[in-house]
Amino acid sequence: MMFNNIISPLEQFEIKDLFSLNINIINLKMSLTNFGFYIIISTIIILTLHLLITYNNKLISNSWTLTKESIYATVHSVVINQINSKEGQNYFPFIYGLFIFILMNNLLGLIPYSFSSTSHFILTFFISFTVVLGATILGFQKHQLKFFSLFVPSGCPLGLLPLLVLIELISYLARNVSLGLRLSANILSGHMLLVILSDFTFKIMSSGIFYFLIGLIPLAFIFAFSGLELGIAFIQSQVFIVLTCSYIRDSLELH
C-alpha cells in the first residue's frame, strides 16, 4: 500500500501554461509557459549577475569576480585550443554566451520543484541546428565550393569515394541532432533518476520508524547523486562548447 499513487518521473518535464491572454478581435492567443518563463528567468539572472559583477569590479577581487574570471578563462582556453589563437578570438563572445546560457539553465533545473528547460530536445536541437547551420555558412563564405572537400577523406581510393562521401555527409548532417540530443538526454536521464529515487525514498521513510532508518541509505545516495548532477551540469555545458568550437574549426580549416 505504501507504493500507491506513484508519481510519474516525466511529469516534471510537462510544459504548462502559466498565463494566457485571448484577443478575440484578431483571434489571437498569447500564453507564457513554464518553459518560456525559465528561459526568461535564466536570461535575467545572467544579465543581472554580469552587470553587478562588472559594476562592483574592484582591484581586490571578491568571490563572484573570481568565479566569473575562472569561467571566462576556461571558455577562452577551450576556444583557443579548439579553433586557434588568432581566429578563435572572433568567436569567443558567442561561445562564452552559449556556455553561460546552457550552464544557467542546467543549474536552474537542479532546484527542487523547478523546470529544466535544457532537458527538452526542442531547445537543445534549436541551438545545435543554429550552430551547425552557422558553421556551414561560415565554411561556404570562406571556401566557396571548396567547402565540399570536407566530405572527401584524404587518401581515399577512387572506388570507395561515393560511399565514403555519403557516410561523411550523413555524419555531418547528424551533428544537428547529436549535439543537442547529447545535452538533453543527459539532463533528462539524471532528473528522472532523481525523481524516481526521491519518490521511492519518501514512501519508504514515511511508512514507519524502521523504514525511516532504512530510508537513510537511499537518502544519502540522493545527496551524493545531486552533487554528481551539479558536476554534470558543468561538464555538459563544456562538452557542448568544445564540440561547437570543433565544428567551427572544421569549417575554417576543412579538416
Curated annotation (Swiss-Prot):
PROSITE patterns: ATPASE_A (PS00449)
MF terms in GO: proton-transporting ATP synthase activity, rotational mechanism
Pfam families attached to this UniProt entry: ATP-synt_A
Location(s) in or outside the cell: Mitochondrion inner membrane
Main location: mitochondrion
Sorted UniProt keywords: ATP synthesis, CF(0), Hydrogen ion transport, Ion transport, Membrane, Mitochondrion, Mitochondrion inner membrane, Transmembrane, Transmembrane helix, Transport
Gene Ontology CC: mitochondrial inner membrane; proton-transporting ATP synthase complex
Alphabetized CDD domains for the sequence: ATP-synt_Fo_a_6 (cd00310)
InterPro entries: ATP_synth_F0_asu, ATP_synth_F0_asu_AS, ATP_synth_F0_asu_bact/mt, F0_ATP_A_sf
Signal peptide positions on this chain: none
Membrane topology listed for this record: Multi-pass membrane protein
Residue span(s) of the pro-peptide: 1-7
Subunit structure: F-type ATPases have 2 components, CF(1) - the catalytic core - and CF(0) - the membrane proton channel. CF(1) has five subunits: alpha(3), beta(3), gamma(1), delta(1), epsilon(1). CF(0) has three main subunits: a, b and c.
Function as written in the Swiss-Prot or TrEMBL entry: Mitochondrial membrane ATP synthase (F(1)F(0) ATP synthase or Complex V) produces ATP from ADP in the presence of a proton gradient across the membrane which is generated by electron transport complexes of the respiratory chain. F-type ATPases consist of two structural domains, F(1) - containing the extramembraneous catalytic core and F(0) - containing the membrane proton channel, linked together by a central stalk and a peripheral stalk. During catalysis, ATP synthesis in the catalytic domain of F(1) is coupled via a rotary mechanism of the central stalk subunits to proton translocation.
Family that this chain belongs to: Belongs to the ATPase A chain family.
Protein's name according to its UniProt entry: ATP synthase subunit a
Organism: Trichophyton rubrum
Underlying gene: ATP6
